[in-house]
Amino acid sequence: MAELRVFADADELGRTLAAEVAAACERSDRPFLLGCPGGRSLRTTYAALEPRRLDRLVAVLMDEYVPVPSPDAHWSCARFAREEIGAPETWLPDPDEPDAYERRITAAGGIDLFLLASGASDGHVALNGTGSARTSRTRVVELAATTRRDNLVTFPEFASLDEVPTHGVTVGLATIADARALRLVLHGPDKRAAAARLLALDRFDPTWPASIVHDHPDAQILVDRAAHPAS
């Protein structure tokens, strides 16, 4: 079962997690593979990262829309990584060769730390929606309507649900669980229900994919007070 850590607010959470990422990266004697989501949840963490301490960092993006958008499109994960993470090196899965992403990760020694977020309405993690198999690997998936609605908030430039892509390429739950450590972030009142659902579980439940954190020996759930169910 994942350990719970509670912070005063999203900024404190982000600073603390960023310091842990930087320290782990500095200790690494090889490229440090950091699994990274796009979207709102990790923004305070990325903002607090110190570029001077991250020369070995490789940002391993967990997903991308299909068809792959222009790297300048507002919904492009490549654009998000460039503007928000700023790692020296960034990897993205290729929908034409999803298995190659798994091989690349394995050949580089595996993901050292996977940062995670949970969908507010359906607990999706990366683009793994309700019912995703625990054994799933990088693949192209059709996005659930709940995931697409959540992405209207993640990418507010979408004018309507009709503009949100219907497919994406995503790492699988087994890809995530293979990482050496997992840190799942929930902050703000709009994530309180998701936090309550996740904290009510003590093992993986395929109806709430983010619960993969409960099936890992080094996993933490980081919430701020606004997201904590008791607040």
Task: Label every model-predicted segment.
Residues 1-34:
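N-terminal glycine-/serine-/threonine-rich phosphate-binding loop
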Residues 26-52:
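Glycine-rich N-terminal segment of FAD-binding domains in flavoprotein oxidoreductases
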Residues 27, 52-53, 105-109, 168, ...:
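Solvent-exposed alpha-helices and their adjacent loops that cap or buttress functional pockets
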Residues 36-41, 118-119, 187:
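Glycine-rich beta-strand-to-loop/alpha-helix junction loops that act as flexible
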Residues 47-54, 79, 130-139, 201:
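A glycine- and small-aliphatic-rich helix-loop capping segment at beta-alpha/alpha-beta transitions
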Residues 54-117:
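Ligand-binding beta-strand-loop-alpha-helix segment within the catalytic cores
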Residues 124-171:
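Class I SAM-dependent methyltransferase SAM-binding "motif I" and its flanking Rossmann-like core
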Residues 171-174, 178-231:
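ATP/nucleoside-binding phosphotransfer catalytic cores, i.e., glycine-rich phosphate-binding loops
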